[in-house]
């Protein structure tokens, strides 16, 4: 583990366990030279602790670059909570996580991410002020999607010669909060949507509301399109999958695509 931290140039890695609520959490602080480490909290059923550690290290590093590129006086961090098979009280679990954050004395600020909601952030906020994207602040997903949408327009201009998205085929992998908001914005701009998600209900919603064409998750990367937009958990591009791509560009919301 220490070798992994050194390779990632991580400042610190913190662990918390709360048997009463089932909390098993990790907070990684990659770099705090510019200020407190900012990064969302993921709540996912990781296969094991090693998978969770690898994810939090990778994501924390990415947040350092994001914060720096955005000109923020903040560093990069990330948190993951290993989602248990059964939770008696989700609110109590996130309150326990809030107490964990508070022990870091402001060195880490959390926010929504995969598997978490603004209601979860409200529970965290009962025990620490170092949290954002609460219900009072609103869902940040549409704003994130707008940034990706703007990036897609710029990408289309650079690669295809026009930022007019009318008729452009965009394949979206992942229809979570950000992915679906992006799909709505692309649909409004006249793009043709090809979508996939492990949640078939989300896919059906996109078909009914946005006229999207469903594609099996395992087939999406090899589906002909103009732009591929990975909006899931990231890490989808590797030596194997890159050779399958049939798109002109990749521009999505996923971390570490």
List each model region and its residues.
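ADP-ribose/adenylate-binding Rossmann-like module
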Residues: 108, 112, 227-237, 241-257
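Short, surface-exposed connector motifs at secondary-structure boundaries
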Residues: 102-106, 166, 187-192, 223, ...
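N-terminal ligand-binding/catalytic initiation module
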Residues: 1-136
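Conserved active-site and cofactor/substrate-binding residues in soluble primary-metabolism enzymes
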Residues: 47-55, 88-92, 96, 115-119, ...
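Short, glycine-/Ser/Thr-/acidic-enriched flexible segments
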Residues: 21, 32-34, 48, 177-178, ...
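Glycine-rich, charged/polar anion/phosphate-binding loops
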Residues: 1, 9-15, 25-27, 158, ...
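Glycine-rich phosphate/diphosphate-binding loop of Rossmann-like nucleotide-binding domains
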Residues: 139-225
